[in-house]
Regions:
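Active-site-proximal region of nucleotide-activated glycan assembly enzymes
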Residues: 1-11
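C-terminal alpha-helical cap of glycosyltransferases
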Residues: 173-197
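Acidic donor-binding loop of glycosyltransferase active sites
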Residues: 86-101, 108-109
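A short, well-ordered alpha-helix in the C-terminal region of glycosyltransferases
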Residues: 162-174
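Acidic, glycine-centered active-site loop in nucleotide-sugar glycosyltransferases
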Residues: 107, 125-137
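C-terminal "capping" alpha-helix adjacent to the active site of nucleotide-linked donor transferases
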Residues: 136-162
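Short hydrophobic beta-strand element within catalytic cores of glycosyltransferases
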Residues: 93, 109-121
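Donor-nucleotide binding loops and adjacent catalytic segments primarily
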Residues: 9, 13-91, 125-128, 140-148
């Protein structure tokens, strides 16, 4: 197996072999059932091209997928999470503030699947739209998340990952927090303008 990190905290990735690039899937602190279902439904197709590191959320592990070469699942990763971000060539994530700041800081090509308005205050949708507008991310709305959409989007973003990284690098001299704040203000202003029409 492939091991990552110092010996005392090394994380094992059984069956991970090159040259398949790693995808990191983060469902959120409590897991994201729809995201997990879509990953599992597409797992055979994903593993033809990628290794998959899947953070499923507490109580969301599916034992039937244990031991699949190129796939490893965890309920949660703590201190090693930055290492997983660094390892991944592509990240699939919810669009919480912590996650998007990490993606921007590490310049990681990513797909954001924000919590729907039915399940949140809508802040993740705002985060995701802001990042997509700046060319940092590709967004799949939860209502649009089908097996086909996920697989085609993964392939599209991976093949064009340099474009997303270049967009982040273009703005690297600007402070990340102020840049995100500016993005939010722009999107909010556009929303208000649309509603005023």
């Amino acid at each position: 197996p492939f091991f990552m990190g110092p010996p005392e905290t090394a994380v094992a990735f059984p069956g991970f072999t090159g040259p398949r690039p790693p995808i990191l899937v983060i469902g959120g602190s409590t897991g994201a059932l729809r995201v997990n279902q879509a990953i599992h439904a597409n797992l055979d197709a994903l593993l033809e091209k990628f290794n998959v590191i899947h953070l499923c959320g507490k109580g969301k592990l599916e034992k039937e997928y244990d031991g699949r070469p190129g796939y490893v699942q965890f309920e949660y990763i703590g201190a090693e999470l930055p290492d997983l971000f660094a390892l991944a060539d592509l990240v699939i994530s919810r669009a919480g503030a912590n996650a998007i700041c990490e993606l921007l800081a590490l310049k990681k090509a990513n797909i954001l699947i924000p919590l729907s308005k039915n399940a949140s205050r809508g802040d993740q949708i705002l985060n995701a739209r802001s990042f997509e507008k700046s060319g940092y991310s590709k967004v799949i709305e939860e209502e649009d998340l089908t097996n086909e959409v996920l697989l085609s989007t993964v392939n599209e973003v991976y093949e064009n990952r340099d474009k997303y990284i270049a967009a982040m690098n273009k703005d690297q001299e600007k402070d990340s927090i102020s840049m995100i704040t500016d993005l939010f203000e722009t999107v909010i202003a556009e929303d208000k303008a649309k509603k005023a029409k």
